[in-house]
Amino acid sequence: MTKIPESSEIYLDTSFLAPYLLAPHQKYQEAQKLMARLLIGSNRLVLSALVLDETMNVIKEVMQSQEDAANLKKGKNHKDYISDIRKAVDTVIQNSNFRITQFNDEISGCSKAVDNIDNFTLRPRDAFHLSYMQDQSIDYIVAGDKKFDKIHACKNIEF
């Protein structure tokens, strides 16, 4: 397991950000504790719009799972959870510890994502997360699974 760095940029994967933002999530307490440690270390937390997209989907899934199955309407959409989604996004965009990033070089970033699929057998979304890190020269990621452990240039702070 990678030690938590100090004064570094750390890319946040959805597997960490969603539990941090969503109290009903089973890993909420664990995420809160790790976030405190990241901030105590004066780290800058980086994410992409892709992470926010994935987080919105997790919010819908978790909130939907909290409902009584008898009251569950078929076809519920993201709008039914808009207050939870808005609260999560506002938490990120209003906090100066977070930085939402895009590619510095979009063409190179997209090409690198394809290379990451080929080189590391990643799913496209994970390949893009790694590509954002490469584009921004970010060495650390907080991810809830071990897929990033196999990547030599990426230091996974396990969650």
Residue ranges and their predicted role:
Residues 1-5, 9, 130-159:
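Acidic, PIN/NYN-like endoribonuclease modules and their adjacent C-terminal/linker elements
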Residues 1-51, 58-74, 136:
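Short, well-structured N-terminal submotif of metal-dependent ribonuclease cores
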Residues 5, 94-140:
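Active-site neighborhoods of divalent-metal-dependent phosphate/nucleic-acid chemistry enzymes
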Residues 12-13, 47, 122-124, 145-146, ...:
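Histidine- and aromatic-rich ligand-binding microenvironments
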Residues 18, 32, 50-52, 56-115:
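Active-site-proximal, substrate-binding regions of enzyme catalytic domains
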Residues 37-40, 61, 94, 119, ...:
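Secondary-structure boundary motif
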Residues 38-40, 73-75, 128-131, 151:
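Short, surface-exposed, polar/charged, turn-prone segments marking secondary-structure boundaries
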Residues 44, 97-99, 155:
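Conserved beta-strand segments of alpha/beta enzyme cores
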